[in-house]
Amino acid sequence: MPRYKLVVEYDGTAFAGWQRQAADRTVQQALEEAIERFVNRPVRVHCAGRTDAGVHASHQVVHLDLDREWRTDTVRDATNAHLRPEPVSVLSAARVGPDFDARHSALKRHYRYRILNRRSPPALARGYVWHVPWALDAAAMHAAAQTLLGRHDFSAFRAAECQASSPLRTLDQLDVERRGDEILVATSARSFLHHQVRGMVGTLMLAGSGRLDTAGVRAVLDSRDRARCGPLAPAAGLTLTGVDYPEAALSAPG
């Protein structure tokens, strides 16, 4: 069966996350139903990162197997036609070999978190930022973030319901910068624990507020205690922005 790789973007506001659920609408369900309507057979899609309810994606990667060859532009355009009016869009489709796996072939995942740091609440960006109305020091947040880089036990930032077999992760990037009224947090790793990014952002917010210094943020990490973590940053500010793969994994078959 030919395998296809799709790059997908979506607004997570209306969805109960990526993964199919019995009652609530999810991104996986919307995408599978759209593809099934044009290929006229059951389809299962597999993603690079299972985003939570309210989390967005500008570059989610999925793979799926179809029972015949289709032009890649047909896969993209027909899926988008059947997705309307869902806030989901297939940006590209490509043929890949049978060994490509959107999740297991990934080398690195990239996320961005947006904090709106001003007194006035958002009107246009509501649903896409965390509004923090008190002053934050982005430079202090960035300095504290650097203490989290490398391979560590990230249990302090892990959700209680996280199903990962190990809390060890290698954090490759955690940068914080201010752009006008917004503070942007960019982070990259091969994989993250459930709620890890949002837990780190909430803790860095405390550093920006002056409630934790750099050593205090590192102490949270070293404690391995979820109770020491800052508040869980809201899902709305988080976007999956990219997934990296080795070139060999992206090669077209034949």
Swiss-Prot record:
Provide the active-site residues from the annotation: 52 (nucleophile)
In its UniProt record, a GO molecular function of this protein is: RNA binding
Query: Which reaction equations make up its catalytic activity?
Result: uridine(38/39/40) in tRNA = pseudouridine(38/39/40) in tRNA
- Keywords, sorted A to Z: Isomerase, tRNA processing
A GO BP annotation: tRNA pseudouridine synthesis
Cite the EC number.
5.4.99.12
Indicate yes or no for the key word Isomerase. Answer: yes
Q: Which InterPro entries match?
A: PsdUridine_synth_cat_dom_sf (IPR020103), PsdUridine_synth_TruA (IPR001406), PsdUridine_synth_TruA_a/b_dom (IPR020097), PsdUridine_synth_TruA_C (IPR020095), TruA/RsuA/RluB/E/F_N (IPR020094)
> Per the record, a Pfam family?
PseudoU_synth_1
* Residues that hold substrate according to the record: 111
The family this protein is said to belong to: Belongs to the tRNA pseudouridine synthase TruA family.
Function statement: Formation of pseudouridine at positions 38, 39 and 40 in the anticodon stem and loop of transfer RNAs.
Oligomeric form and interacting partners: Homodimer.
Q: What is this protein called?
A: tRNA pseudouridine synthase A
* Organism, scientific name: Methylobacterium nodulans (strain LMG 21967 / CNCM I-2342 / ORS 2060)
